Amino acid sequence: MISTTSKRKIEHLKLCAESPVESRKVSAGFEDVTLIHRALPELDMDKLNLSIDFLGKRLQAPFLIASITGGHPDTTPVNAALAAAAEELGIGMGVGSQRAAIDDPTQEESFRVVREKAPTAFIYGNVGAAQIRQYGVDGVEKLIEMIDADALAIHLNFLQEAIQPEGDRDATGCLDMIKEICSVLGKPVIIKETGAGISREDSILLQKAGVSAIDVGGAGGTSWAGVEVYRARKSGDYASEHLGELFWDFGIPTVASIIESRVSLPIIATGGIRTGIDIAKSIALGASAASAALPFVGPALEGKESVVRVLSRMLDEFRIAMFLCGCANIQDLRNAPVVVTGWTLEYLGQRGFNVKDYAIAGDSF
C-alpha cells in the first residue's frame, strides 16, 4: 500500500509538470543585475574552463539539478533520467526528500537509481528540517547510505509546512539538531531553502552551526505555497487554498538572498534560475554554483536525452555569457564587475548592504 507521503510526492510532481506554479508577482531579481560586457574579451570561447571544485568533488560546470522527486514508483524513471544526464554532463544533482523511503522502505529504489545512473557525479541526499529531530543522526546516516551521497541537504520548507493541512509546524530545536548533525556526520551538510530565501540573520546562525554550504532557494521560482493551492482546491480545503494564495509570493527573492547569505560559505543560487545568463549573474554576485529544478521536470518525464538537451542549452548560454564578460574561468567570473539596480538595489540598501562595491572589478567580499 502506498503511503500518504509517497502519494503526496507524485501529486507534487504532476502539479509542477502540468500547472503554473512559479511566483506570480515577485521575480528572482535577475532583471536588476547587469553583467559588464567586454567588447574585447581576448579569449577563445571554446577554451574557457567552466569547472569547479565543490564540496570535495570536481564539477564540469558550476551547476546542479536541484532536488525534484523520489519516493513513489513512478518517480524512479524520472530520477534515472535526471541522474544519467548529470553524469553525462559532469554536473551535480540532489534527490527529492527521502522521507517517503523512511516511511516506506519499498520506495528506496526510486532514490537508489540515482547513484546507479550517476556513479561519479556529485549527489546529495535530502531530508526536511522538520523531520531531522524524529530521525536523529542514525536516521540521517541511513539516508546517506541509501544513495551513497556525497553530501546531505537539510531543506527548510516551513512556509509549505504552515500551509499544508498535514504540515509539521513545530520548528523548535531544528538549529540544535543541525549543529549536532554537522558535528558528527562524515559528509558535508547543505542547508537548503525551498522558495522563500535565506536572510543574513539565518546565514550567520547556519555558519556558526557548522554547515558546509547554503542553498538560498529564493523567491522567484517555484512557489510551494502555490503548489499547495492546487492540492487544496482539488480536495475542497478552502482554508488552505486561501493561505496558499496569500503566501504565493512570500519570501526573499533569489538575487537579494545570494547577497544576504554571503558569510564565507559556498552558496548555491536556486530560485528562478532559467538561463545560462542567470547562472553567470549568480556566480558574479558570489554564488559558488547555481541550480534549478522546474525546467527539468517536463524533460525528465520524457527521458534522459530531453534533460541533456535542456541542460546543454543552459550551459552553452552560460559559456557565452562568460566569454562576453571576458572571463576565462569561474574565478574570473567571481571577480567580474556587476551592477545592481532597481528594486533589488533599494531592498539591499535598506538592509544595509553596499552593492556599489559589486560594480568594481575584483572580489572584495
Swiss-Prot record:
Gene3D superfamilies, per database record: Aldolase class I
UniProt catalytic activity: isopentenyl diphosphate = dimethylallyl diphosphate
Subunit description: Homooctamer. Dimer of tetramers.
GO cellular component, one term: cytoplasm
Gene symbol of the encoding locus: fni
Family statement: Belongs to the IPP isomerase type 2 family.
EC number, as in UniProt: 5.3.3.2
Name of the protein in question: Isopentenyl-diphosphate delta-isomerase
Residues the record lists as binding substrate: 8-9, 97-99, 160
HAMAP family: Idi_2
Function: Involved in the biosynthesis of isoprenoids. Catalyzes the 1,3-allylic rearrangement of the homoallylic substrate isopentenyl (IPP) to its allylic isomer, dimethylallyl diphosphate (DMAPP).
Required co-factors: FMN; NADPH; Mg(2+)
